Structure formats: C-alpha cells, structure tokens
Design a protein with these regions (language model features):
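A beta-strand signature from Gram-negative outer-membrane beta-barrel systems
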Residues: 1-24, 163-165, 170-172, 185, ...
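Short alpha-helical segments and helix-capping/turn motifs at coil-helix boundaries
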Residues: 5-10, 170-173, 207-210, 306-311, ...
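Outer-membrane beta-barrel channels and translocator barrels
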Residues: 13, 170, 181-182, 216-218, ...
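Surface-exposed loop/interface segments of Gram-negative outer-membrane beta-barrel transport/assembly proteins
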Residues: 15-154, 197-202, 208-305, 323-392
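Outer-membrane beta-barrel architecture
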Residues: 24, 174-178, 189, 212, ...
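Short Pro/Gly-enriched beta-strand edge/turn motifs at strand-loop
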Residues: 154-160
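Short coil-to-beta-strand
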Residues: 182-186, 332-335
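An active-site-proximal structural segment forming one wall of the substrate-binding cleft
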Residues: 320
Length: 392
C-alpha cells in the first residue's frame, strides 16, 4: 500500500448534457493493509555462528529453545536450551536470556532508567546514576552478574513486522454542481480525500476546488475555460527505501530498515522504546527504535497548486477562424524535516524547512484556415505563435 496524490482536473461542462441545474454528491471509504511482508523463519534466533548474542542484528544464532530437540534429532547436533555461561545459569533458567535493553555491554548507560529490568541484589543507584554497593563504592565491573544483568526474558519468536503496521483508511468526498443551457454551461467541483497510512503517524489530505465554463456568445465568440486549486498536505516518518545492511545509520535510516531486519526474538511491541526521563530513544543497539522513529521524527509537505486554461475562438468567415488559447500552472511546496532530540545520530535534534515552487505560463495565438478552392483542391492550415514562460 502507498500514499499518493490523485489530481482531478475540472473541465467545462458539455452542453450536450441535460439542461438545467444538477447537483451530485459522492462518498467513498476504503481500508488498506500492507500488501506483503518478508517470509520470516522462526527456527533460529539472534546471534552468529550458531551462538546467541543479544546485541547482534541477524538471526544466525542457535535454535529457539522450542526448536532445539527437533533440530538435534534431525541433524545430530547437540544444542542446549541455555544461552548463558555456567556462572550465570543461576540467574537464567533454560530458554531465557538477559533483557536486551540493559543486559548487554552497549546498553549499560540505559540501566539507570530501567531499574525494574535489572537483577539487583544488595546494590542500588548512586546520586550520579551509577550502581553502588552497600558502602557507596561504584560498581563498574560488568562481570558482576548480580549487578549488571537484566532480568530474564523468554526466548521466543515475535511477530514484530505484522504487529507494527496498522490498517490504513481512505475517505473521499466530492460535490459537483453543474448548470447548462443551449449556449452555456458552468461546472463547479469541491472534493476532499483523507488518507491515514499503514505506518503510524503517516497520512495525506487533499482538498480541490474547480470551476469550468463553456459558452458561445450572441456575437459568435466562443469561450471555454477552467480554473483549479488543489492543496495537498502530507506527513510521514522516515519511510523511504530500506537499507540492506546494518539498518543504515542512526536517525537518518528508514523505519523499514529498522523493522525488517529485527531479530526474531526481540519483542519490539513489548519492550520500552522511550527513555522515561529524557524522552529519547531506547533500543538494543546504537540505532533508533522504529517505534520511537514514527512518534518523534517527521517529514511534512504542504503543496498549494493553481492551474487552469482559457480558450477564445471566433469565426471571421466560414473558412477562417482566429483563436487565442492560454494555460498556467503554479505550485509552491513548503517542506519541513523534524528530528527529535535524543535520537542516535541527531542527539541534540534538528529542524529544517524550505520552499520549492514552479510556475509555467503557455499562450498560443492561432489562425486556422479551411477553404475549398475547387472540387479537387482544398486549402487547410494553421498559422500561429507560441509564448512559454517558466520560472522556479
């Protein structure tokens, strides 16, 4: 599923339609879901070389505890359900591991913010946020399991991808009012579409106004024209194409890049993702949590577009017609990019905004000839001049 812009041009009403006033209203609603996700395996967990590693990206570790017996029977291997050393087995029963947000070396700095996720026996936090023992001495040795290890978490596969996306919705409303007579017609259109995307905090809203006329005056002058205004406002977290290695880099990466490469045993929808004190990012690696990304980093675009055309035509004789035809198209796009402080790359935050635009005017002056000179000879042709102006 994707979000986009549907551009509807309001045309002058066709005078061949029924005469009088006509009013039409249309309402439609649709839901959308992600079309497909990768086909994930639930046999092997986080790590490398068939060894569990709570700080690793890929799923190259040993089998999930629930799969150990089947794998051993099939391949003659000797995997166990334990993923920790014998010295830590008292803290972690088979099939469990230290909580990944606090129980691996890269996340010691997060321990002071999540005391409930830590095994602490006889230790506490000092005033500076560092663990101290009963005499107030700092404990900095990560081999002291009773201090620095996270609480046990059960190692099992989680549906992080399917649980992340939401059901999108598309609501469209349109009102059309038209009136026509033998020599003239008028057509007015007002429409709005609102689309909430499949990614949280992603959406687009479009409002359009259009007016068209079509008339032949008593003096023979033919007039046809339309003018349209469209406003398109959209917002989205970083959700471009996914990187295929190590998630890309920091806050600059895509939500998809963070999400699709998560270890199967990492409970994205169950673990904390926001620092309860600073509001910053919380993750098991030096990258931004996809849940934190969609809530805090956002790109916006607000496009205002005006376009239209006008044609004037007059028959000087039954074989000679003069015509003036012009059109214009102008838009401005106000964009912004917000990165909340506390992210991995943009730790102090960032904000930028800029405006892009374009204007084009096109005019044609034409003299059209269509004359029968004799039964065997006919002269047809167009003489004209074009003026085109573009600016950005």
């Amino acid at each position: 599923a994707s979000n986009g812009v549907i551009l509807i041009t309001t045309k002058a009403n066709n005078r061949s339609t029924s005469k009088g006033l006509e009013v039409r209203y249309n309402l439609s609603y649709a839901q959308e879901k992600i079309s497909s996700v990768p086909n994930y395996q639930d046999t092997y967990m986080q790590g490398s070389n068939q060894v569990y590693n709570g700080g690793y990206i890929g799923n190259w570790g040993q089998p999930f505890p629930s799969q150990v017996d089947a794998i051993n029977a099939q391949y003659g291997t000797n995997y166990t359900q334990s993923v920790v050393s014998s010295s830590l087995s008292a803290f972690y029963p088979d099939g469990t591991a230290p909580h990944p947000l606090v129980g691996i070396s890269r996340n010691y700095s997060q321990q002071q913010y999540f005391p409930d996720l830590l095994i602490r026996e006889g230790y506490s936090f000092g005033s500076d946020g560092i663990f101290v023992n009963g005499t107030g001495d700092h404990i900095v040795d990560p081999t002291n399991a009773a201090v620095f290890l996270g609480v046990p978490v059960v190692l099992k596969a989680h549906d992080n991808v399917g649980g992340f996306f939401q059901t999108g919705s598309l609501m469209e409303n349109s009102l059309n009012v038209s009136s026509s007579s033998d020599k003239a017609s008028v057509n007015f259109t007002l429409s709005n579409s609102s689309n909430d995307g499949i990614i949280p905090n992603q959406g687009i809203n479009r409002t359009a106004l259009g007016l068209g006329i079509n008339s032949t005056l008593d003096n023979g002058l033919y007039i046809q024209g339309s003018v349209n205004y469209v406003n398109t406002a959209q917002k989205s977290p970083p959700s471009g194409a996914s990187y295929n290695n190590d998630y890309g880099g920091g806050s600059g990466g895509s939500v998809y890049g963070r999400l699709f490469y998560l270890p199967r045993n990492f409970d994205l929808n169950g673990y904390p993702y926001t620092n309860p004190v600073t509001g910053g990012n919380t993750f098991y690696r030096a990258l931004d949590n996809p849940r934190w990304l969609v809530e805090n980093n956002q790109f916006t675009s607000d496009v205002n577009r005006v376009f239209g055309n006008l044609t004037l035509s007059y028959d000087l004789t039954d074989w000679l017609t003069v015509m003036a035809r012009g059109g214009f198209n102008q838009y401005t796009d106000q964009q912004s990019d917000f990165r909340e402080k506390g992210g991995n790359t943009f730790n102090t935050g960032s904000y930028g905004e800029w405006t892009v635009g374009n204007r084009e005017i096109d005019m044609n002056f034409l003299l059209q000839i269509d004359k029968e000179l004799s039964p065997d000879l006919r002269l047809s042709g167009t003489i004209g001049h074009n003026v085109n102006e573009r600016s950005t």
